[in-house]
Structure formats: C-alpha cells, structure tokens
A protein has these predicted regions:
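Phosphate/NTP-binding elements of NTP-utilizing enzymes
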Residues: 1-133
Length: 133
C-alpha cells in the first residue's frame, strides 16, 4: 500500500499513467510529456524541491503543450493532496472552456478507485467568471 501511495504522489508517474488528453484529431490518448513539456516540468520540480514558490511567466508559447502540463500538475496536486484548491484564469471564455474540458477529461478517464469525491457536479458555466474591461 505504501508503494502505491508513493507512486500516486509522484506527479510524473501519475500524469503519464492516469491522465488522458484529446488530440487534435479527437482521439483520447495517455498524456506523455514532449521534450518542451518535460523541460518545463523539470524546472517546476526543481523550484518545488528547493522550497521556492513556483512563479513562471511563459510568453508567446503556442502549441508546446505548456497549458496541458500545468493543468496536469494542478490536477495532480488537487486530487492527491488534502485541502488543496487550484485556480486557473484564462484570457477568454473559449480558453476557459477548453481548460475546463481538459480537466473534466482528466477526471472522467481516471480509474474509479482513484477519483476524488465531488461535492457537486461542475458545469462549464460555473467556472466562467465575468470580468470588467
């Protein structure tokens, strides 16, 4: 049992064994980190191991999968640690919807024995926060 708990707390193991993504051609596949994602993951883990708060600004990164790996890390932290809440803010309602659907797919594809309990079902409209310009 201790080995299983240790593996579930290992973010890379958890992400690559339990989380799934939807590809551009709409296939559902296990999330396997690409080299750029792996570099970002390594930087984040180094900062965490050093006890530093992780603050990363990524400028103009498109189609590298950075949002996916960040979302996967947030999901892992949220479902494997007690009293952890995460928040992602997107620049548009379309981006918010995309991130919400990614998170929902992570949850839906988890083995039932690993799914955290939910107080209530969330809908996309629950997650969109209006903002003033």
């Amino acid at each position: 049992m201790k080995e299983l708990v240790a593996k579930l707390r290992d973010a890379k193991f958890y992400i690559e064994h339990f989380l799934h993504i939807r590809t551009k051609d709409q296939k559902i596949v296990k999330l396997t980190m690409k080299p750029a994602q792996q570099r970002l993951y390594d930087i984040i883990q180094r900062e965490r191991a050093a006890g530093k708060p992780v603050r990363i600004v990524i400028l103009k990164a498109r189609q590298l999968g950075f949002s996916t790996v960040i979302e996967a890390l947030f999901f892992h932290d949220t479902v494997t640690r007690q009293l952890v809440e995460t928040l992602i803010i997107a620049h548009s309602s379309d981006a918010t919807t995309k991130l919400f659907r990614m998170n929902k797919l992570f949850f839906d594809m988890l083995p039932k024995s690993l799914r955290p309990m939910r107080k209530r079902k969330r809908r996309i409209r629950d997650c969109a926060v209006p903002y003033a310009v």
